[in-house]
Each structure stands twice: as C-alpha cells, then as structure tokens.
Amino acid sequence: MMMKLLFLIALFGCVVNSIRINNDNGLSFQSNCLGGSIQIAESIPLALNLQSNLSTHDAWMELITNAKKSIDMGIFYMTLTDGGQLDPVYGGQLGLDIYKALVDANSRGVSIRIVQNQPSSSMPDTDTQNLAKLGVQVRSINWPSLVGAGILHTKVIVVDQVSAYLGSANLDWRSLAQVKELGVLFQNCPSMVSDTEIAFQQYWDAAVVTELPSDWGVQYQAAYNQTNMASLLLNGNEKFEMFLAVSPPQFVSTDRTGDIDALVSAMNGATKTICISVMDYIPASLYNSPNTFWPVMDNALRAAAYNRGVQVRMLISHWNHTNYAIPQWLHSLDQVNNIDVRWFVVPDFPNEPQVPFTRVNHAKYMVTDEQSYVGTSNWSEDYYTNTGGLSYNIYNDEFTSQLQSIFDRDWNSPYSFPVTTY
C-alpha cells in the first residue's frame, strides 16, 4: 500500500505541475515540456553506407550520464560487455561505454532498476548479475508463467521520470554496432514520460507475483490514450499529440490503448501513404503450436490500398534467420494494386568471423501521411497477443516528415531489393 501511495504521489505530482496553454485551434498544450525535445535515434551497422543524425549509443549516453535520481529499464536482455572480447573493429566498445555509464551512475547515487525477461542459456544475465553485485536492483520476469506464452520484448529506458528512450534496440552492443535500429529519445517531458513510467512499473511489479491482476487498479491507470492524447510543446514550440500503447492485452490497464488497436487505427486513418519498416511481417503466429492465421494487420493494409487508394510501401528484413513462412505472404501483398513490398538486406561485415544474430534491419516503425508509429514489436500475432511490447504514437508534421525521410533513404538505398528476389 505504501508503494502504491508513493507512486501515486509521484505520478500526480507531474500532472499537477503541468500548466496548459491554449492555442488558436482551441487545443490545450502542456507547458511542462517547454524546453523538452523528441528526436529519432538510429543504429546504423558498421560498414553500412547510410547517415543518421543521432545514434542509439549517443542517445543512451545522453540519458544515462545526465541521470540525477533514477534510471528504470524494461528490457528483453542485456549483453553490453561481451563485444569487448572481439577485435575493436566490430564495435564492442560501444556496449562497454553504456555499461560503464550505468556503473558510474550507480556510483554517484542514481537509483537503477532493471526488469528483464527470465534469463536463459541463450540469453544470459551476466551483465545484470554484475550490476546487481554493485547495488543495482534487478528483477527477472517469468513471462510464460504469467501470460501463458511469449516474452518481455520491450526496450524502454526512463530517466528521472522526465526523459526516456523507446525503440527497437536491445541492451546489446550488437544493437549499437552491428544491427540496424530505430527509436525515440524524449528529454525533459514529465507528462508523457511519467505515463511511460507506469508501463515500466507494471513490469517491475509483475516480476514478483505469480498471477497478474484482473484489474490493474488506479495506480496503473493511463494518463493518455488514443482518444485522449497528450498535447505537448516540444523542440522549441512545436505542437505534438501522442500516446503510449501497450501489448499484450493482459498488460492493458485502465484507459490504456492496446498496441494492435493503435497500429490498425493508424493504418485505417491513412489517406495517402503507409510506409512500414519492420524485421518480420506475417499475418499469422510464428511461435505457437500450431501456428494460426491472424489477418488483422493484413486486412487493414489491403483495405487501405484497395478501398481508399492508399499507397503502401513495405520494407521487410531478409537475413539468415528469416522465417521460411514469411515470403509467401509478402509476395501475395505485393500483387495488390497500390502495395509495393521490398526486402532490406544488410550485407555481411567485411571482417571474419561474422557475429551471430547481426547484420539485419531490426526496426519496427510505420509512418503514414497522418502520423508516426514507433514500437518494440515485430509484426506477427504472437507479439501483440502474448508478448510484452510498447509503442509511441506521434502526431506532428515535422517529426513525421523526418521519419518519412529515413524510410525513403532506406527504400532508395542499395540495400533494398524487390520482394521477388527471395
């Protein structure tokens, strides 16, 4: 009860401190984000000839080195240090930088909490064990025992309840140096970040129970959702509207929008264009037994293209671990008028040996003519019905234009190939 009371005080303290300013359209924008910013952060694999404005490494360093009170991390796993065993040309130092920044933050009295998916032999917890020995609070969540299947797949970092990262990058040196990633860096925006903190708190609390609550209660109630978005002033005086969405349904608390609902709504709201960049796309489950057809996303895309004439472009990853069932569905979509599907292929690293499970576009985002969607989930049924994930759903013309430019850069790059290639 005391923990819940303190959490409510922290949450509603942020809301009370939020002054609102009316604009000419009658919308009310929260001034507690004045001086705040939102940026796109990318990881461009070494030896890939693409340019980005802000790297994931630099975004994380900015967050961690400037933390004053707290760092809360909801993650799949952490392997930041094992790249240090390789030749420096592979980029392992980037992970060591982040690990050292966490150690330094802990040393200067910053409270660090990490909740991770239950470790396994393939996903060891060496780094988090070592951090725990230094006093970092670490919890592991046995996801299948709570949900029935799936994993905690989220990648979110919340700092001082005012700044955050959310995106595709795992806490892994490979995600900084050898895998293509995309996420969002929020700075100095208490209202939206405190709402993101609620999702972290759900993971943190779920790690110490044997059964999920049927009703998450008022302390986990969302501040914003699809019908009541946060209205923010960011990047100077730019007006943003946005909300956080959550999967799976078992973690959708009161007033929270489900992730698949947010995704399909964005597709349904597009009037001109839908551009998708994601590692896996399949209108079915991938990890169930048996796997089953799940056309929720597919129907929305086909309806957008066929019924409304929306131009749909899909950039899907092809790599050593592409599931054999995926290409047939993409070939089918590519036959629909107004839908164009291409593969994105990251070439092997110039040096040998190759690092396993790298050299892939791991991003999970969509940009339409109306909005941006930046998430942590691959696009198959499993990720939305039994796997832990989050997304930021963002309405702002300039941000959407920037994300569109990134998509167009990749679409027109030498790493993009017709879907008929595979």
From Swiss-Prot:
EC number: 3.1.4.4
Gene3D superfamilies per UniProt: Endonuclease Chain A
Sugar-modified residues: N53, N225, N320, N378
Domain PLD phosphodiesterase span(s) in chain numbering: 148-175, 357-383
Activity regulation, per record: Inhibited by butan-1-ol.
Catalytic residues (positions): H153, K155, D160, H362, K364, D369
GO MF term list: phospholipase D activity
Keywords, in A-Z order: Glycoprotein, Hydrolase, Lipid degradation, Lipid metabolism, Repeat, Signal
Signal peptide range: 1-18
SMART domains: PLDc (SM00155)
InterPro entries, A to Z: Diverse_PLD-related (IPR050874), PLDc_3 (IPR032803), PLipase_D/transphosphatidylase (IPR001736)
Enzyme class, UniProt record, top EC level: hydrolase
One Pfam family named in its UniProt record: PLDc_3
Record GO biological process: lipid catabolic process
Reactions this protein catalyses: a 1,2-diacyl-sn-glycero-3-phosphocholine + H2O = a 1,2-diacyl-sn-glycero-3-phosphate + choline + H(+)
Source organism superkingdom: Eukaryota
UniProt function note: Hydrolyzes membrane phospholipids, such as PtdCho (phosphatidylcholine), producing the free headgroup and PtdOH (phosphatidic acid; signaling molecule on its own).
Stated family: Belongs to the phospholipase D family.
Name assigned to this protein: Phospholipase D Z
